[in-house]
Amino acid sequence: MDSHSGEPALLPCGTCDMVFRSSALLATHTQRFCIGHPTQEMTFGAQASVATEPQRAAVVPQEHQGVPQEPQGLPDQQASRSALKRLTEEVQWLRLSLQEMRPWITEVPRVFAGPWTRSEARPQSPMSEAVGSPSERLRALFRTRARRVAEMEAQSRALQLRGEELSRRLQVVACTRGGMSRLFGLEQEIRELQAEAGRTRGALEVLGARIQELQAEPGNPLSSRREAELYSPVQKANPGTLAAEIRALREAYIRDGGRDPGVLGQIWQLQVEASALELQRSQTRRGRAGATSGELPVVEAENRRLEAEILALQMQRGRAPLGPQDLRLLGDASLQPKGRRDPPLLPPPVAPPLPPLPGFSEPQLPGTMTRNLGLDSHFLLPTSDMLGPAPYDPGAGLVIFYDFLRGLEASWIWVQLRTGLARDGRDTGRTTALPPALCLPPPPAPGPMGNCAILASRQPVPRLPPSSSVSLVCELQVWQGLAWARAPQPKAWVSLGLFDQDQRVLSGRWRLPLRALPLDPSLSLGQLNGIPQAGQAELFLRLVNARDAAVQTLAEINPASVHEYQYPPPVSSTSSLEASFLTPAVGFADPPPRTEEPLSGVKDRDEGLGPHHSSDLPPVSF
């Protein structure tokens, strides 16, 4: 205390050796906060903590020696109050900490006992050496506080580990309880399934007994009728007919598991009605063919009479050569039939006669069909001689005969051809739709593999200016699956030039392979051959002058006659094509086009294979 002689008088506490600057602080400390001398390690920390703030307060006035004491009375009191308040809070906090730590001191592992003992033993020697030194007591208080903080952190870690272990145990217990609940749920479901299986087994036994009873009854009309309806022999039907489609529908229904007697009975009734209609239709055709055969002798007699009259007229004029008018009259008389004939019995069509040359001998041409009534046969040409590059009359135009299609896919039910003209590789925008044709089985003849369809349509193209850039463009559209259920889908196309470089019609029987889409009318024949073919589909048509349309109308259309058609040659090689046909001698001139009557009565679109004739289509023009 002698070292503080220059400082204001400090009042020590007689119990805990703490010093104060005023008697009020000392009295308050003695009454409320004094805890006496530290007798154990637990109370030493509290006593040291109490002495922390007074030491700081005692050190502060050392920096202000020589300052009068009277002016510092009011600030000293405020500082003392704040220091007292902080000291009180710290003491209370330390006391509560000690009370909370006492139950856990005995549970701390022995691992920590050594450091605690050593750490507690260290500050006793300086305290015993300098009990009254404030700096030593402050340092001891700091060490004790740091040690307590470390101990509390260790205890908190131990508590945290123990809490985690308890959490794991709780989770294990919860999982065990959840597994038991799931096991109970599974057992309940198994019991329910076993009960359901028992009920199902009972129902099956009852059903089996009922089936055995029904099988045991010999004269059960219901079962016999159902078996008869289900397993009755299927009526045979020609492919491509309505009865065949109904039969396919019945087979598909049975294949999919259908066993309804009512539905099967209706299908069977529809098949019977369709077969009856097909039979009636075939009988009607045979009757019509028989009537036509009966009229044939009458027509032949009328033709012979006309030929005799022509011969008499020739004899009245003398042996002079016949003129162009007589030749035209003779051609008309031989071409115009006087009734409907069966197409296979008609004579082969002939081309219009050509005028004779002066001094030209009359040789007998092979292949002509005449009655040999004194008439020279060189005036009539066979059909093959007519088809080839020929002079063209723009006023009369040309005619296109669409005969049939071969190599169609099996999934196509109906087909339709859309035609149009193109000039200089650009479509004119006018298209014509041919009547839809039913796909039929292939004929027993060589040709493309696949079904066929008979088009049997003709289309006049009047007043068409000749040009090598004019071409015919055809697009094939098909129906698949159920017919007429949706719009047809385009599948292929083809293009054909109508004139050569000399502006002659490329008349002939042409066989055109259909090409894959997209459609491009600007392609030449060489470029068109580079496009892949659409399967094996091919179009068979005839291109003739308008003056030859009447003859070609009488030609029969048979899908088996593929050998009569040829592939179109390049435009530059038309001379070789022309050389393959029989051409007249020098001096022959193509006769002027004769006035043709409209052939509106030629329409015959019988279904099935066999001879057909072309039907009319509206004319095409630019």
UniProtKB/Swiss-Prot annotation:
- Organism domain of life: Eukaryota
Q: Coiled coil where?
A: 81-102, 146-207, 294-320
Query: What residue spans carry the Basic and acidic residues bias annotation?
Result: 593-615
Tell me if Disulfide bond is a UniProt keyword of this record: no
State if DNA repair is listed as a keyword. Answer: no
From the UniProt entry, list the residue stretches annotated as the region Disordered. Answer: 334-356, 584-622
Q: Which UniProt keywords apply?
A: Coiled coil
Quote the biased-composition stretches of kind Pro residues, using this chain's numbering. Answer: 344-356
Q: What's the protein name?
A: Coiled-coil domain-containing protein 17
Gene source species: Homo sapiens
Taxonomic path: Eukaryota, Metazoa, Chordata, Craniata, Vertebrata
Per the record, the gene is CCDC17
